[in-house]
A protein has these predicted regions:
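Juxtamembrane intracellular "pre-TM" segments in multi-pass secondary transporters
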Residues: 3-21, 198-242, 425-432, 436
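Helix-loop boundary and gating motifs at the non-cytosolic
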Residues: 17-67, 240-241, 245, 250-268
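Hydrophobic core of transmembrane alpha-helices in multi-pass small-molecule transporters
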Residues: 32, 111-125, 328-341
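Residue-level signature of mid-helix packing/kink "hotspots" within the transmembrane helices
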Residues: 67-75, 125, 158-159, 283-291, ...
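Helix-to-loop junctions at the C-terminal end of transmembrane segments
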Residues: 74-85, 169, 290-301, 385
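Structural signature of the two symmetry-related core transmembrane helices
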Residues: 88-102, 182, 304-318
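Cytoplasmic helix-loop-helix junction between adjacent transmembrane helices
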Residues: 118-154
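C-terminal transmembrane helical hairpin of 12-TM major facilitator-type secondary transporters
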Residues: 303-343
Length: 436
């Protein structure tokens, strides 16, 4: 009994000494550069659209197009992730999305801006491959930390870049910012060219002669069983509830995401440089909160950690709208960065529920649901904002509160063995699995 206990202790990853593979660090480096380029323009972008004559509803249309393009990319992205070399899929899709700032530069109205953002969001075709690659490359039992490191890389890249973008905009004009973004996007794509082969893919190839296959490399075509395809995923009740609860929260967030900077400009009379500074504060919050959520995910469970983080987001959002104090606004913006912090870690929840059945299709289905329900969110938010500045924020807070609470409940059930991947072990016919 003692020997068995000691063996289990040796197998369990030490929370204070988690090994982060080289592949994860390279993904984080690429995400840092991409995040820097994205942060240069993202917070000023809605205000820039207003400056070229777009109405709040038209700004909403642009962001709705973004969500539609993201949704359209999910299923093909899942197929690509499971049929082809994930490293090549990641590299090619990043290169495809890099030129999008050029279209922002050329935009004279919301139409060209919508084309540009469709190109950017369509390049998320490679996101299922990136998530599946990260899941298969992560140290066993530390997927929360791995996804956290990747998301922190992106968030850290966005900390200083909004300030830089605001300064560049004031000195050389907002269009120059888009050229800077292009340069950083291309640099980030170059980093992706150095990704190593997947560790679990190599293991599955070695085991193929004996008739075994690694679950994390499973899927369509050459990758074998895995999730059992989209039909198998749709029959997994815990996974479907997880998708539904988080999708409600995503809809609410993307409904108000383009409104935050507009609210600062319209209601708080903030300048472009001030909006960039406040965007930096949100990015700092995203980076620091990601570390907290990732650590909590590995200790308490991803679904519970993400759900609890969403409840903190709700309180911050309400205070942001209801309390006009500059000091409170600063604190709230820092905490509002927590939504994207949780979104960077939530993909580890796919592995927590499905375990080694989590393949490219599983990540694609999760992204598809989240993006599809969010398509009309930005447009609805813009239409409501044109009539009442506070209404979309109150609605978003209510939806996230419900979704976050239900996620906490679902996560507790998963950890206690009443649902998700743990319960799946009790169901005959499902492949045996271990925690990612």
């Amino acid at each position: 009994m003692t020997l068995q206990h000691d063996a289990l202790r040796r197998e369990a990853p030490r929370s204070d000494r988690v090994l982060i593979p080289r592949a994860i660090w390279l993904l984080a480096a690429g995400m840092f550069l991409w995040g820097f380029g994205y942060g240069l323009h993202t917070y000023m972008f809605p205000v820039y659209l207003r400056s070229i004559g777009c109405t709040p509803s038209q700004v909403g249309v642009v962001f709705s197009v973004s969500m539609a393009a993201t949704a359209a990319s999910c299923i093909p992205g899942g197929v690509l992730a499971d049929r082809y070399d994930r490293r090549k899929v990641i590299l090619l899709t990043w290169l495809a999305g890099a030129p999008s700032p050029i279209l922002y530069y050329l935009a004279r109205d919301y139409r060209m801006a919508a084309v540009g953002i469709a190109l950017y969001s369509g390049s998320l075709l490679g996101y299922p491959a990136l998530n599946a690659y990260a899941a298969s490359s992560a140290t066993a039992g530390a997927s929360g930390a791995a996804f956290g490191v990747i998301n922190v890389g992106f968030a850290v890249g966005m900390i200083a870049s909004p300030l830089v973008g605001g300064r560049v905009s004031d000195v050389w004009g907002p269009k120059t910012v888009f050229l800077w973004s292009l340069a950083f996007f291309l640099a980030a794509s170059c980093v992706m060219a150095f990704l190593p082969p997947e560790r679990r893919e190599a293991k599955s190839e070695a085991a193929a002669g004996a008739g075994a296959a690694a679950g994390a490399a499973a899927g369509a075509g050459p990758r074998g069983g895995g999730s059992g395809g989209y039909r198998g995923l749709l029959r997994d009740g815990s996974f479907m509830w997880f998708i539904a609860f988080y999708s409600v929260c995503a809809f609410a967030y993307y409904m108000i995401q383009p409104l935050i900077s507009q609210y600062l400009a319209d209601v708080r009379s903030s300048s472009m440089q001030a909006i960039g500074m406040l965007g930096t504060l949100m990015s700092l919050g995203q980076a620091l909160i990601t570390a907290v959520v990732a650590r909590a995910a590995d200790r308490r469970g991803t679904v519970v950690a993400v759900g609890a983080n969403l409840l903190v987001f709700v309180v911050s959002l309400l205070c942001f709208v209801l309390v006009p104090s500059p000091a409170v606004t600063l604190v709230c913006l820092f905490l509002l960065g927590g939504f994207m912090a949780g979104q960077g870690v939530v993909y580890a929840g796919v592995g927590e529920i499905l375990r080694e059945r989590a393949d490219g299709k599983a990540f694609a289905l999760f992204s598809l649901a989240m993006s599809t329900v969010s398509i009309f969110g930005p447009y609805m938010g813009g239409a409501m904002y044109a009539r009442s500045r506070g209404t979309p924020f109150y609605l978003a807070a209510g939806l996230v509160a419900v979704g976050g609470a239900l996620l906490v409940r679902e996560g507790i059930a998963i950890r206690s063995g009443r649902g998700g991947g743990l319960a799946a072990e009790q169901i005959p016919g499902r492949p045996d699995s271990t925690t990612i």
